[in-house]
Curated annotation (Swiss-Prot):
Domain writeup: The BAR-like domain displays limited similarity to other BAR domains.
Species assigned in the record: Mus musculus (Mouse)
GO terms for biological process, alphabetical: cilium assembly
Cross-referenced Pfam families: FAM92
Protein name: CBY1-interacting BAR domain-containing protein 2
GO cellular component: centriole; ciliary basal body; cytoplasm
Amino acid sequence: MNVVLSRDSQVRAMENTVTNAERYFGQFCSLLASYTRKTARLRDKADQLVKQLIDFANTENPELRATIRDFAEDLAKVQDYRQAEVERLEAKVISPLKLYGAQIKQTRADIKKCKRVQNNEIKQLEKLEKLRQKSPSDRQMISQAETSAQRASVDTNRSTLHLVETVDAFQEQKLKDLRRIFSDFVTIEMVFHAKAVEVYSSAFQTLENYDLERDLQDFRAKTRGIYGHGEARPLTDTNPAPSVPWPLASQSAQSTMARQGKEAGGEEDSETDSVEEIPLEDLKGQQQGPRD
């Protein structure tokens, strides 16, 4: 009976391992999926900001218009990288975590089967003990009960050994996957933020280089010329704003506007749909990420 109790304790420990994996991996999957969705929403809001900056730039003088244009282009580039970040999180983090549902279900089925075999062994041993107490002289019945108990014990040993091997393989794979998934998560975030810092630095420098005094002088010259408060000085490079918006100069701005068009078509909830995965190393060598 001590052997039976020892095996039961062993199975309970393995069951706890699977239960904890089911609980925490499920929470990881849910939280990281929410993290990815919110990152996609942040990308969409930034796309809207880029669009508003473009519209605003078309109403301003050439100096400010050029500055805001370049600034918007940099923000659009960051959203390219953020789009790539979302795609990689889906492929490298969310999808592997989702696979654990099926693995845990199969392991639980193996545990349940092993427990049924153990319960049968306990019943056979209890039956044998009762026969020995009630009919100690009935050697035939006792012999049959001993045979059944021995057969049940062999089945239990075999089932327990199989379960130990199954849970051991499950635990090993779980540890490897845990390390790989979160390593990929950190790598994805580091690559995005490294690229974002690079582009944001360019955006900051664009704003620092903006000649506010020149723009203000141009504005004052125009307003004084209109209302006759003084002679307007000759202007250089102050052609009036074109009647149509300036063309989008980069693929980043074009892809931003394309995402805006998708949202207008009622597809704003599709930001977390999986797309073809782009290798992490590709992001490190490119200046802007794919979107569609």
